[in-house]
Amino acid sequence: MDASMWIAKTGLDAQQTRMSVISNNLANVNTTGFKRDRASFEDMLYQNLRQPGGQVGADAQAPTGLMLGTGVRVVATEKTHTQGSLVTTKNALDLAVQGDGFFQIAQSDGTIAYSRDGSFKLSPTGQLVTANGALLQPAITIPPNVASISIGQDGTVSVETAAGGGAQVLGQIQIARFSNSAGLQAIGQNLLKETTASGAAVVSQPGQAGAGKLMQGALEASNVNVVEEMVNMIETQRAYEINSKAISAVDGMLRFLNNNM
């Protein structure tokens, strides 16, 4: 009986974790460039009471085994890197990656993090930065008193000054790609960190070597589907209730034994 309660408890723990993942997805439904997470489960070790094909008589073998499971556990949470819808903002510093790739963001410790959030701002020195002040890499500095800023699909940044004289190219934004984007580690602030599972970043010009193109004046919305998450929430709630009822049923069986034995 104790084993049954323990198995049901693992089910409660697993569904609680899944509910946390779903809640985080829904909380970030309006977060620019956010990628939804999903929880993956696996069954735990089995108690092998009889091996399949084992001897059950003088001349007979068991066609099946007798193996009792010991529950379930969450084995991973994984980001789903599907394209979010593009929202037009008409802000010259807003960028969206249409396709595969991430913006490169410099961290205070000198490392590079990666993001799909292209809502950039100008720092006091004219550099392109995130909402938290982290520098976009390669660094782009916009001179003062520009009349317009143009960012091409290939990442080329050019400006026109109020004095005229034609477009002046300032540099080119490059994006990074990974062989296994699901292996990136989320670190908050819309940032992801390279890991051994993700593989090394492959930096290239937008639109080249499989990299996505840039779209100026637009942002990528979260790829969270609210209806899908609500369905997942109901499924999780029902699974949690079923495991809770299993514990109650085992408790009733134990109570019956105590009262009648």
Language-model features, listed with the residues they occupy:
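Amphipathic alpha-helical polymerization modules
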Residues: 1-261
